[in-house]
Structure formats: C-alpha cells, structure tokens
Amino acid sequence: MVWEKSKEANINYLSKIVNIQQFEPHPNADKMKIAHVDGYNVCMGLDEQPGLYVYFPVNSTINPNILSYCNLYRDCEKNKDATKKGFFEDNGRVTAIKLRGTPSEGFLLPYEALTSFIQDSLNVVVPEEDVTNIEFDTFTYNNKSFWISKKYIIPVKSYPVSNQSGRKRSVKRFNRVLDTQFRFHYNTTLIKKEPWAIQPNDLISLTSKIHGASSIFAYVLCRKPLTILDRISNILTGKKWSENKLIYDYLYASRSVIKNANYNPNPNPGYYGIDIWGEANKVIKPFLTKGMTIYAEIVGYTPDGKYIQKNYDYGCVPPENNEYVSEKNFKVRVYRITYTNIDGITHEFSAREVQQWCKNNGLIPVTELYYGFAKDLYPDIPINEDWATKFWERLANDKNFYMECNSPECNNKVPHEGIVIKKEDMHARAWKLKTYAFLNKEQLELDAGELNIEDNA
C-alpha cells in the first residue's frame, strides 16, 4: 500500500500527514487551542493530544465514506453511529472559519482514525512506518486506488441534447498542438503551504492577484495538415509518407482548454458560450513573436454584458451597441511570458522583464506592488528562525498592498483577491497569498452553488 498523488491532483488541495507536538492557547477561547501546519492555523478542542494527524486544506472535500466512518457529518443519519453528530455538510467540504476572531484554516483528523477506516472498510493493514510530511490524495492498494480527498468543485448538471436536424456530417479533426511547444500555466502554490520558500536574501516580486479568467496566447511551432503534394515531397526527400510539416502558428487557451487546437472546427466558446479568449487574443496576437507565449488574466465584462467574475468590474462598463472594446468593456493583464525555441527549450521571463516588456510594447502587466529583497520589505523584522512567520503575518495584513481591503481597481466594493509572489531565480513557479475576505467570499459562492469559470472553462 502507498499514499500517492493522483495525476489529477492539485498541489493546493493535497492532504498531508503531520506530527503535531505543540499547541498554542487560543487568544479568545478557553476551550480551544491552536495547532500550526506549515503557515496555517487550525483551531482544535482542548482534549486533542499531540501525535500524528492528517491535515485537509480549505476547500478540499473528504471522501464521504471516511466522513461517515468517523461520524463527522452534521446529518446524523449519514454517520456510522447515528447517535453522533459532526459538523461537515453533505458535500464534505473543508471550510475556513473564524472562531472567536481567529481564522481556522483546515481540518485535522487523527491519523489513527484514517488508518482504522482503511483497515476496517478496505480490509488493508496499514504498516507502521514514518509517514510524516507525506502529501497525497489517493490510497493505493492491491492495484486499486481509493481517493481520500480532492479539490471541491461544484457538480455541473448535464442534460441530454436532442438532435433535431437529423444526421450530421462528421468533421475530421486535426490536432496541431505540440506538447513540447505549448504549455499550460503551472498551479500557483498557496504560500501558506510553503512559508519557508521565501528567504530574507531572496530577490522577490509582489504583484496584485486579480480575479478574472486565465488565458494563454502563443505563437509556436504547430503541426500542419499534409496535402497530397506534401506527402509526395516527403517520399521524394526520404521522409515518412505521414511525417508532419511544422509551421509557426497562433494558439489561444483558457486555463485548461486550448480553444483552437484543431484546424477544422470552430473554436470552443467554453464556459460563457461566448469566446472571450478569442476576443482577448485579438489584443495580444499582434505582439507575439515566434516562440513567444503570453499568460494573462481577462477581467471586466463578456460581450453579452455579464461579469467575467461576479461583481468584479475592474473599472470596465458593460458593452453597448454590439461593441466590445478592450480597456473599456474588458481588460487583459499580462502576468507571465515565456520563449520556446525549436527544440522545445523554454526561457522564463523574469518578473521584472515581464513588466518592462509590456511597457515597451504597449501592453499592460499586472500591477507591481514591490520589487526588491524580501528582507528590505520589513527591515524591522529580525532575521532569525521566526523571520518567515512574522514576514507572512505582516504581509497578510498590509494595507499598503490592499490586504483585507476592497479591490482598488474595481468600482464595485469587492474584496481584493491578494498577492502573487515570485522569486527571481529563473524557475517557473509562483506563490499566492489570498485575503481572508476573498476566501470567505469564495466559500459563500460555493455554498450557494455558484460555478467558477476557473473550474469549468
């Protein structure tokens, strides 16, 4: 048996086995205490003892069989022991909650409770071994997999579509995308998972995290459909009959779907039924040079006057008279640029290069809030083993960066999403620090069953 990360796992929603040996008293509640998991605080009852726990992050969902076995459902009828009552709703989602003014960010389940479930329900003996700090979402045994937790996504109802037009001619699809040329954006890690990732002497960039639709625009090598003449040419030049011809071409995508991957079909309009990515592509495409990929956020309104993200206008106004104008009805803000050569080797623009390239070429990057050494942001914090803890506590509440404030870029009063942190070390990675106000807004939307474009685009 083994604890594993599935192929679909999102790094921010993995469960983690932790060894909790110390607690802090809750500042405002005599019957609670606080455990620390990386950069997170988790409120617990006074009776909880030191030992191994499984940490489940906020907005992950726990397997219903585990919740039932451990009697954690609020609905007693769902629990193994119907006389016991927990606090999880039917969806099994882990929520952040302020308890007497102190945020509790996640849920800790005794490791023994999880192993007892596995032994009793799956008939698998969990060996005694050092499992501290293992991250996982799946338990694998006897060539079988059992999911433990995953990111909570609102289920989308699907409805059968009747074919009223009779038999339709099928369209042959040709996928032109080379996975060595086009790359989706990496998952941005929650900094509270890795508070040690930034050290005092690191050169860092802080930019505003804005709430819109992720997008990718690329001018990279693609496959070209072969004509009869191309195939004959292949034979005459000693190549395989079906060997693809490569050309530079334009691609654009949402966070997880390439909209024009195929030559023949019309681009996929996606979540909105309207191709906002195609509209944004018209803005970015003229600036792309061979090998370049630009990653950006689209904010404001859709062509039919809906918010791209509910209530987040970013200074835009709804379109009128069938006009959809950049910087008036929607905005595109660049946050990452790469260059990929013909061999598939990618160069990552530094955070400062992204800012300068955009300004030199007439595009607008995300707002840069700070650029410099981490230690110089708050020079009064002593550089010792507690530096990271104090640094992130200070940053999480820094009004200069609009933390726990309304968005400075929106006319509507909506919570600022937070900050993106990058380290200038030529590695393709970034971290994010969200405001608690924004996290609470996300939770309320999940409770209301409101779909998120980033999960469905």
Task: Enumerate the predicted regions with their spans.
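Core nucleotide-handling region used for phosphoryl-transfer chemistry
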Residues: 2-457
